[in-house]
Amino acid sequence: MSVEEKVKKIIMDQLGVSAEEVKPEASFVEDLGADSLDLTELIMAMEEEFGTEIDDDDAQKILKVKDAIDYIAGKQ
């Protein structure tokens, strides 16, 4: 499973959204209905899945699906 596929699966599991909704340009808050707690849990799930730490400054820049995929891919 690719980084993109894993990130999308985490997003679907954490936010309870469908694969069709998880588009690269989808905003977690505006398009996928996430709140601040959802975003925190999403970051924690990605950290656990990929064995990396996402610092708070970087986490605040992860606003869209593509941001998360690009960030994690850059850490691999």
UniProtKB/Swiss-Prot annotation:
Subcellular location: Cytoplasm
SUPFAM superfamilies with a match to the protein in the record: ACP-like
Entry keyword annotation includes Lipid metabolism: yes
O-(pantetheine 4'-phosphoryl)serine sites (modified residues): S36
Pfam family, one: PP-binding
GO molecular function: acyl binding; acyl carrier activity
Predominant localisation class: cytoplasm
Residue stretches making up the Carrier domain: 1-76
Transmembrane segments: none
Post-translational modification: 4'-phosphopantetheine is transferred from CoA to a specific serine of apo-ACP by AcpS. This modification is essential for activity because fatty acids are bound in thioester linkage to the sulfhydryl of the prosthetic group.
Alphabetical list of PROSITE patterns matching this protein: CARRIER (PS50075), PHOSPHOPANTETHEINE (PS00012)
GO cellular component terms given for this protein: cytosol; membrane
Pathway assigned in UniProt: Lipid metabolism; fatty acid biosynthesis
Domain of life: Bacteria
InterPro entries named in the record: ACP (IPR003231), ACP-like_sf (IPR036736), PP-bd_ACP (IPR009081), Ppantetheine_attach_site (IPR006162)
GO terms classed as biological process: lipid A biosynthetic process
Keywords noted in UniProt: Cytoplasm, Fatty acid biosynthesis, Fatty acid metabolism, Lipid biosynthesis, Lipid metabolism, Phosphopantetheine, Phosphoprotein
Function as written in the Swiss-Prot or TrEMBL entry: Carrier of the growing fatty acid chain in fatty acid biosynthesis.
Family: Belongs to the acyl carrier protein (ACP) family.
Name of the protein in its database record: Acyl carrier protein
Organism: Oleidesulfovibrio alaskensis (strain ATCC BAA-1058 / DSM 17464 / G20)
